[in-house]
Amino acid sequence: QHHFPLGAIEIVPNAETAAGVMNLKEIALASARVKSALLGTEDLAADLMAERSVDAEELAYARGRFLLECRALGIEPIDAPFTFTEAQACEREARRSRKLGYRSKSVVLPDHVAVIHNVFTPSEQELAHARETVLAFELARAEGKDRALVNGLWIEPPTYLNAKRLLERARQLAVA
């Protein structure tokens, strides 16, 4: 009816139980159309028999494991939605998620869209630092050095690649 080519629609599995998180590899490999996966919140907490809290400490292990599994599988992890109403707490959780390595987060409350968008969009300061990192590393390599020093941090290939990824992400988001 809508004339989508066969296989064009991606599948985004939701890991909302302990079994879902533990079996993510099998779920993700079930179809080449799985390019990302979403971690659940409330169903997962209930399945774990965890006491829900605003800081989501009870989901920390599952969040980390889910992220690790997704990255190992080459699929994009989508962090669990923040299901409490407080915007400041939502921002704190989103910042923790981004620090862990998530690049996106599910939303269930309309008021949280702008908060999450702001957290996951690279700032001009972050972009300037990434540009400085890339430039310094490339200059060091051109001089035959294996790393560069930027603001007290030795820049080696992993940090350089993360800076390049951040710049690419900003380009994709049209903020670079």
Residue ranges and their predicted role:
Residues 1-176:
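Expand to "…catalyze enediolate/carbanion chemistry for C-C bond making/breaking, isomerization
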